[in-house]
Amino acid sequence: MCTAATYKTDGFYFGRTLDYEFSYGDEIVVMPRRFPLAFRGGAALPEHYALLGMAHVADGCPLYYDAMNEKGLCMAGLNFVGNAVYAAPRGGRDDVAQFEFLPWVLAQCASVSEARTLLAKTNLTGTPFSAQLPAAQLHWLLADKDECITVESAADGLHVYDNPAGVLTNNPPFPQQLFRLNDYQSLSPRQPENTFAPSLDLRSYSRGMGALGLPGDLSSSSRFVRAAFTRANAVSGRSETESVSQFFHILGAVEQVRGCCEVEPGKHEITIYTSCCSAQRGIYYYTTYENRRICAVDMHRCDLDAAALARFAPRTEEDIFFQN
């Protein structure tokens, strides 16, 4: 289970939590402009926009969980088990396997508007990367500073939805998630007024009672509501550091703590990492479950005209600053 969100101050920020019971060996990976991309449908991109994000590198190929490109377009794939249905290959150059969907979009598109045009002619297939890495059932959040969309592949085709909430979790399908926000329209960050029975002497006995009823469990539908509420009401300074800090606080509202979500006896889902893409600066910030310090990789400190990946292992040991 995962949660992704967008946030805008003077800059545009995009990121996600990756929640799972184990890691595949994730790395922060810069894909420079001349890293050759060959897609299973036959298309090839010898040159393209540079990418930066978190990925599992298999046989030299970065399988991105989330990333941004040098133009500020961002994308993340989240579990959509039981609802994702991919098409069969048609034998054309626009056949794109699920695992290569993110670089297919980010390598070519500078904006959500351009991505919409590309998606209209893309046939998203369930072709696996390998026998050891079958096709993951995903849906995607895709955003730039001006637009945010959700992309879902279902039995009746590829759907592109406007996403005014700026968040995404997992099941159910996005239209149902968005509709469910209607149930919480009375919630507020402000203290409530007594509209229950003005004749009764009802008083707020605690701060935060305006949001009484906000879901607090770890299910994907509850995390969607909680993330949407937190994002919509978050107040931040305008600077880069203030914005990045606030973004991590927003996603902190849906973090998974070891022991609270048991997937089988002795195995628990945790927030393996949380990311924040500063889309206009090309900086990928992240924290890990074991290291709460915000770390960063700046794509512009790498050679973006190179042909080889630049790979950075995430810092996973707690980094505590002693003041005496």
What are these regions (language model features)?
Residues 1-94, 121, 126, 311, ...:
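A contiguous strand-loop segment
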Residues 1-13, 127-129, 135-136, 144-145, ...:
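C-terminus-biased signal that marks the final domain/tail of proteins
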Residues 8-11, 69-71, 143-147, 152-157, ...:
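Short acidic-glycine loop/turn motifs at beta-strand connectors
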Residues 92-128, 240-249:
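Proteins synthesized as precursors that undergo proteolytic processing into mature forms
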Residues 121-159:
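Catalytic cofactor-binding cores of redox enzymes
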